[in-house]
Amino acid sequence: MKIPHVTDPVSNMVGGMAQVVRASTHAATGAVNTMQMLASPVAEFAWPVVQSVAKSTGRALGTGHSPNFANRVDPPVRWHNGQRVHLDLDPLLPFPRWHEYAAVVEEPVRRIPGVAKGHVEGSLGRLVIELDKNADSDVVLGKVRDVVIALAADLALTGARSAPKVAPFADPGNPLAILMPLTAAVMDLVALSAAVTGWVTRLPAVPQTIRAAAALVNHQPRMVSLLESRLGRVGTDIALSITTAAASGLTQAVGTPLLDLACRGLQLSEAAAHQRVWRDREPQLASPKRPQAPVVPVISSAGEKSHAAGHNWTAAASNEASHLVVGGSIDAAIDTAKGSMKGPVESYVDSAANGSLIAAASALLAGGGTEDAAGAILAGVPRAAHMGQQAFAATLGRGLANAGQLVLDPGALRRLDQVKVVVIDGAALRGDHRAVLLARGNTPGWDDDRVYEVTDALLHGERAPEPDPDESPATGARLRWVPLQGPSATPVQGREHADLVVNGECVGGVDVGWEVDPYAIPLLQTAHRTGARVVLRHVAGTEDLSASVGATHPPGTPLLKLVRELRTDRGPVLLITAVHRDFASTDTLAALAIADVGVALDDPHAATPWTADIITGTDLAAAVRILSALPVARSASESSVHLAQGGTTLAGLLLITASAGSKSASPITLRRWFSPVNAAAATALVTGVVSASKVLRLPDPTPQPLTAWHALDPEIVYSRLAGVTQPLAVEPGTPDWRRRLDDLSYTRALSPLRKPVTKLARLASATRQEFADPLTPILAVGAAASAIVGSNIDALLVAGVMTVNAITGGVQRLRAEAAAAELFAEQDQLVRRVVVPAVATTRRRLEAAQHATRTVTVSAKSLRAGDVIDLAAPEVVPADARVLVAEDLEVDESLLTGESLPVDKRVDPVAINDADRASMLFEGSAIVAGHARAIVVATGVGTAAHRAISAVADVEVSAGVQARLRELTSKVLPLTLAGGAAVTGLALLRRASLRQAVADGVAIAVAAVPEGLPLVATLSQLAAAQRLTAKGALVRSPRTIEALGRVDTICFDKTGTLTENRLRVVCAVPNTRMPHDPLPDITDPHSAAVLRDAARASTQPHDGQGHTHATDEAILTAASSLNSHTDSTWSLIAEVPFESSRGYAAAIGITGNGKAPMLMLKGAPEKILPRCRFADPEADVAHAESLVRHLAEQGLRVLAVAQCSWGHDTTDDNDTDADAVDAAAHDLELVGYIGLADTARPSSRPLIEALVTAGRNVVLITGDHPITARAIAQQLGLRSDARVVNGTELIGLDEDACAELAADVQVFARVSPEQKVQIVAALQRCGQVTAMVGDGANDAAAIRMADVGIGVSGRGSSAARGAADIVLTDDDLGVLLDALVEGRSMWAGVRDAVTILVGGNVGEVVFTIIGTVFGAGRAPVGTRQLLLVNLLTDMFPALSIAVTSQYEEPGEDEYQTDEEADEARRTHQHEVLTGPTPSLDAPLMRQIVNRGVVTAAGATTAWAIGRWTPGTERRTATMGLTALVTTQLAQTLLTRRHSPLVVATALGSAGVLIGIIQTPVISQFFGCTPLGPIAWSGVITATAGATAVSVLAPQWLNKAFGIAQLNQE
């Protein structure tokens, strides 16, 4: 089939292209001829596009036809695939609100024979036609055109004329998207061919001035903007491609076209993938069955600036700039507001453009020619920055397209690195099913829970569950929807109201919204990890997600206004939203239009979101991947900028040295084939591709449904889960090459090498991670610069230091991982899975699951949602599960909730807002009593325990001291570079050669870079980690030790961390005790009697099994401690174990005095007291309740103990059942009360008191009741007036509000795992360096979030230990104080080492500058001499200081008692922790300046003595060099004279120096000469004098150089 008017287009195409060519350079003539040859084969494919481009270009150049003859212009074909055609209506209907006449156009078109379907897409301005399969397209489209033209003529007579409309989006179906990169790639091939041919045939190359002129135009943003205003984007791209290719070919430069060819190839593959997705999704997106979005005219700021009239119609608000097509061509554009903000690449491009112009001007002013100026321009080309960004975006775009995502605007992927705010619209979080948000019963038999479960069943099309005995049947139930009135009726809120009607009677009301999408949790977790501010616009049902975001806005907030304000206040915005039938679409589409990156989910039943940049599928999985690309895009762009900066620096240095060196270089030079700029660009391109590939290889997020299983009837839960079990989660597939290599490694020949090769591979991987150190790029550039100027030894030194540092760090990482693996090794958990027989109905299947006796033992890892598991004490729950059967079931959830007491579980549904969720079992909890059957609802990362951990799974690990050193380097590096520049400038003033001057300057600059900093940081942390490990603290992440030295807030989990998670009897209180009397000791006779009776009522262990309940164990243990033997006076007859429904345990027995049998009861006071008799009921009951309340306020769990005579027959204890006991348990005699509490660790209170005394803020976080939490806090040493906040107070708070609350709170009670993360994050936002100490799975996420995560070993959860940076391996929490002291010590060591490294280098720079000024124009020390100085003064002395402890612990005295030794240790810890906070700021700068001044003074004095005494210049330089070393070594000795290692290192370095200086051959190699007695006397005098000044007059030095004297640490 053919599309009309696509034949013979060559002449028109060439004419349009010629207009563009005339606007560019004449040097592109060859490329134009190439385009003419290519025109014919691509014409049929590209003609509709090229025709529009030609018209646009003609208007831009002042030629072409007037646009005001729409009734004589055929509507152009914008896209076709043979059967579906898009006709552009813009030229035909040039008046506003034309979309209101869509029906007038559609009806006549549909009646044309051969047209199967036809409709107008108003947002696109297109007539979309689907042809019959057998229709002749030429004939049909001809008739369509005739009909449309006639209709347009009629409508034009009545419509108000205005400027034409344009398409509001970048058309992925546009063939130009492929034609443009294809054309540019062909031009690059031609340029490559020309360059290689010219070099092979030795044709003369034109001056590089031509290439520089092309680069200047191509990389000057202002020039590009000017061309775009005249030629349009397409014309500008063509013109620049031609000029660049022609210039590269004529100058025989291979690198530029080769790199551009690679980049164009990526763009071509991206465009092809986008077009493929467009072809697949267009029938569904542009379907006539979908509702049309409202079209609103807007004023575009870009249209006002363009020469041709340009208007924009889109779903937006008046006066809002949106997408624009300049001049009506297919330039496709981007909203000008979107392009107005700059990311790292755009900012650098601007500065590089200005810098290259300044460099070129400087070259001309310095007497250089045009070639030198051209070289300066080419050295400043930011090619690497562009390449990295384009490579990342193109690779990511192709991957998204391959996954089926439609990218309407590829420019959005280029803006990912700019995003500062992520706005998530609650409409995008809407699931597929309706959900009950609130249920209210108003009739007997219809409580809230019953209304909820019946309504939920109706919404899901299920049969309502059978009623309980006290509930009414739901026969004939239906929902009657009630329209909302007033402001709450805003559709965007997503809330509707309905009445539940049964047999015509309204029995309750419900608020109905939508379920939350299963990918909502992964989406919010990923957004949290992007580093951008996350904002959530709520819809009904998303309120529980507030804690995961930075700010929230209520339902009904205008999305357009919100996005606009955030863009203005905080920067570029990425918006994730969706258009739904019951949501306001105009506001959503408008917000998508102005968002910098608009991502919209596609709802096939709603309007197509054409204003989005990216249209995903119907779920959030693709949006999760896009969000995960944000930090990677930012990192890739920053890396590209750094590469560009390094390439420019090296290219400029190469330019200077080459111009000063030989001119006889071969045509194949680094400058032409492999220049630093091109090398950096190639590296950036590869890095961009690799970074994007990592994003695309990320596994798909795991759905985490938030269904309220606890509120549903078991039958409903079983029907939704059973029979539809999900497949097991599998790891991402292993690549074929990796699998083949793995198979090959098991062969007989290679199997012996498998283990060592694996170790080497792991070491290589760990070493590669260490190369990510922030100082690595700086040192790499320095090494390359040294090599360029001929200082190969310095280059090798720097490279060697980098390698040694990375290997050392890698080894430590592997050691830590191995130790952690050994510590955390676990056995595979086994669980009994119930085999459910196949039966007909859901109810019968549920009954079979509840009563089936056959089970199979399987691995917990193989469980899936829908499996039924069987559990009994003391097993651990392997997954989240809904209880189906509960027999006296009690569960220990302390590792999850922090609640130290067991909780009762039951089968009945609980209220949807009930935080206890008593019908659920959660992974990690332990069964302490009873038996359970439960159906699995979530496994793996979908469980509640793992959900909190995964929320911070990828939180950036503390950068350690490296980050602080990077800040220091950023301050010092400019000074060292300035020193190198000063040496070069002074040398030139003294008429030194350019090459020599530059070499001296580079040598100084490189030598002044503290290349030992990374190694110092690594080894100091390693040494501190080893010292801590010896004290019982395993350091898994050495980088966090630096944060230990700065910690000012420590958060403690209570249960299992500060306590042993084991109940003990605190007191036994007789009933006669007054409420406020001091608690008696259990050894008191009256208290012992109460404890004895409580023990008699406790269930005794049987058959060697453990105690059934933790309370029984605690009471029996306490009772046995008072009696060395069993209570022989009590003969047990029968017992009734505790059951939650009864609330007490009972026992029947006979005492030794032969009295009648007694019934002993022990249970909750609210169950026991009503059964007791009192002489004065009113007063006695008030007294009892007051006493119970007083005990509870002490943080105790209170049990009441009572007794009475048993008057029944006891000959057959089988007849003594629970019902008989319950009937007899009246008129009881109240004996007293038992108070139980969790057992505190012996080291807890001393630790808390020491931390508080040292000025640390201690925060207690627990799942206990607020009253219990307050009491425990006081017992542990916190203030009695400490504020206690309930976890419910945190619900709904955004990040800012939570930070404000957390600033002055010391105790948090009843908190969930997610809220623990919220608390830690809030403290961090308050500027506090936070540590988190915990032992449970509920602590793991907070441990990972904290600056320092500390796990407590022992009974604790492996999840907590696995998330921790430091693991305490024994029960002594006092090791934490040692860790804090070690952190301080490491900081002090690093500070002194940095003083040696940086301060010594500063002194070297100052000495070199002085020597250059007063010498012969050359630096007094050369490259090799500076190498010697760095080796002797920087590396080994600095390392010895870094690995030794600053604070000496008090020595052991054989005459000291243990108490005296502990007191001395505590005093030492207090002195260290109460000192000033370690800092690398003012105190360090003072020490650096002092050392630099003293070093320079000593070296300069010795050098001056050498000049004033007879001798050669080499002797003088040697004296200065020697004093330079000895002055620094003397200061090092003074810093740590108590350390044998430092003393030995300093003396050893001095000995090596003397040996090198005095050995003739070696001395000459280093540019020195042996010194005589007079020279040595001068050196010693200078060294001693300078050192004496630093010791005797430090304050004078501070004042002389403007450094404020601060308190010494």
UniProtKB/Swiss-Prot annotation:
PANTHER family: CATION TRANSPORTING ATPASE, CATION-TRANSPORTING ATPASE I-RELATED
Disordered: annotated span: 1447-1476
Gene3D superfamilies: Calcium-transporting ATPase, cytoplasmic domain N, Calcium-transporting ATPase, cytoplasmic transduction domain A, Calcium-transporting ATPase, transmembrane domain, HAD superfamily/HAD-like
A GO CC annotation given for this chain: plasma membrane
Active site per UniProt: 1053 (4-aspartylphosphate intermediate)
Main location, first listed in the record: membrane
Acidic residues composition-biased segments: 1449-1462
Organism: Mycobacterium leprae (strain TN)
Top-level division of the source organism's lineage: Bacteria
Protein family: Belongs to the cation transport ATPase (P-type) (TC 3.A.3) family.
EC numbers: 7.2.2.-
Positions contributing to Mg(2+) binding: 1335, 1339
Protein name per the record: Probable cation-transporting ATPase I
